[in-house]
Amino acid sequence: MKFLSNLGCMQGRLSPMINNKIQSFPSLYWKEEFSNAKNLGLKFIEWTLDYDQIFSNPIFIKKKIQQIRKLSQKYSIKIKSLTGDCFMQNPFWKKKRHTREVSDLKKIIQACSNLGIKFIVVPLVDNGSLQELWHEKKLIIIFNSLVNFLKKKKIIILFESDYNPKRLRNFIKKFNPDFFGINYDTGNSAALGFDVKKEFYYYGDFIKGVHIKDRILKGKTVRLGEGNVNFKLFFRLLKSIKYKNQIIFQTARSENNKDVQEMKINLKYISKIIKNN
């Protein structure tokens, strides 16, 4: 039952889609999402950060930071995590030269720290996937060089990866567990055909963030319950590791722009599983 008080949604999931993108910062509607989330009984919103016009995002603008704080307090919606789609859109670990990108990363860490955001999700999937060994080596060197800065700013980096369970464990063990962890995405793991029991066996103790979605094996994101995710088993395993952090809905979008209603359907589905598990 504790999980019910940890539910939240990805920013943009309670707003109309922009340019037909499944996920992007809802520049016109981000304020309204606080009241929408409150009305749905959610406790968290996970902030999103795109590479395009990155520093126009409210987390970098003093006046808008104050608005975020006021809305968060007014509607009792916490912002404890940020998904950096900007990293996936412009993966600096695939570049020979990356000085500016690392400088930008430190600015993002600072902005999150200012707002009391604790977790930054770095997606190592799709365009951000570590396809070459040198990508991985470069990423490890860069992020490990930031440990003292992360400690000072009280930030934890969460990697979301397409690595198989054993390989992901070997990867995450190359980082200090006080400042790094894994963001587990239910849908992505199901789409890749991974065995959820093996995943929790190999790296369950490193999971510090969760994205809830459903996907078809090797296929698209679908409404919860219509894909290959075994949510009953997932929540039993999540309970077994004594997971206490936020659980963020990154679910399929409504096909007719009724996103709040779509979230309501998904929330009902997961709430029932949690109560009966």
Where do the protein language model's features map onto the residues?
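N-terminal pre-domain/capping segments
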Residues: M1-K107, S113, S161, R169, ...
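Acidic/histidine-rich catalytic cores of soluble enzymes
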Residues: N6, S15, N20, L82, ...
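A structural motif
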Residues: L42, I117, I207, Y243-K244
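Charged helix-capping and loop-helix junction motifs
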Residues: F60-Q66, H98-L105, H135-F143, D195-E199, ...
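Alpha-helix-loop-beta-strand connector modules within alpha/beta enzyme cores
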Residues: K64-G84, I140-K153, F231-F234
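An active-site-proximal structural segment forming one wall of the substrate-binding cleft
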Residues: K96-F119, L139-L150
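Active-site groove signature of glycoside hydrolases
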Residues: N114-E132, S161-D162
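A short, acidic, flexible beta-alpha connecting loop/helix-capping segment that sits on the rim
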Residues: I248-D259
